[in-house]
Amino acid sequence: RNTPGPHGLTPYEILYGAPPPLVNFHDPDMSELTNSPSLQAHLQALQTVQREIWRPLAEAYRDRLDQPVIPHPFRTGDSVWVRRHQTKNSEPRWKGPYTVLLTTPTALKVDGIAAWIHAAHVKAATTPPAGTASGPTWKVQRSQNPLKIRLTRGAP
C-alpha cells in the first residue's frame, strides 16, 4: 500500500523517517559513503525521527487492538452464493450455490471458480427445511397450439 494514512506518511516514511533517497546503489563510489560522517549523522537523525513518529502511530493503532477483527463465518463444506459484479439484463446478482473448499481469514476458494473470492463477496446459501416448499407450485398444461403451454400458479 502506498497511499498515505491519516498522518500523511507513506509506509517508507513511517519506517525510515524521511522520503526515499534517490541514490544509485550500483555506483562504484558508494563504498566511500559507508564510512562518511554525514551518513553517521543521518542515521542518528533517523533514529530520533523514528522515536518521534512511532509513538503517535503506536497510539493510533492501539485503538484498533480494542476491537478485534472477527473472521468470516464460512467453513469448508459450506454452501455459499458468490456475488456477480457485472450483471446483464435479467441476470441474478448472485451465482451458485458453490461448495467452499478452502478458507483464509479474508478469502474463500470455492468449487467451480478458479480464483479466490473475498469473504465480503459471498453470502451463505440457506436451504429450506426438508418437506417445506420454498414458494408457489406451478402447473403446466398443454394448449391447442403445439408451440404454446399454459402455466398456472398454485398456492404454496
Swiss-Prot record:
Q: What is this protein called?
A: Gag-Pol polyprotein
Q: Consult the record and explain the modifications the protein receives after translation.
A: Specific enzymatic cleavages by the viral protease yield mature proteins. The protease is released by autocatalytic cleavage. The polyprotein is cleaved during and after budding, this process is termed maturation.
- Gene name? gag-pol
What are its cofactors? Mg(2+)
The cofactor binding remark recorded in the entry reads:
Magnesium ions are required for integrase activity. Binds at least 1, maybe 2 magnesium ions.
Keywords assigned by UniProt, alphabetized: DNA integration, Endonuclease, Hydrolase, Magnesium, Metal-binding, Nuclease, Nucleotidyltransferase, Transferase, Viral genome integration, Virus entry into host cell
Indicate the segments annotated as coiled coil, or none if absent: none
Which Gene Ontology BP terms does the record give? Answer: DNA integration; establishment of integrated proviral latency; symbiont entry into host cell; viral genome integration into host DNA
Q: Keyword Hydrolase on this protein?
A: yes
Query: In the UniProt entry for this protein, what further remark is given in the free-text comments?
Result: This protein is translated as a gag-pol fusion protein by episodic readthrough of the gag protein termination codon.
Name one molecular function that GO assigns to this entry.
Answer: nucleotidyltransferase activity
Supply the EC number(s): 2.7.7.-, 3.1.-.-
Q: What is the documented function of this protein?
A: Integrase catalyzes viral DNA integration into the host chromosome, by performing a series of DNA cutting and joining reactions. This enzyme activity takes place after virion entry into a cell and reverse transcription of the RNA genome in dsDNA. The first step in the integration process is 3' processing. This step requires a complex comprising the viral genome, matrix protein and integrase. This complex is called the pre-integration complex (PIC). The integrase protein removes 2 nucleotides from each 3' end of the viral DNA, leaving recessed CA OH's at the 3' ends.
Keyword Metal-binding found: yes
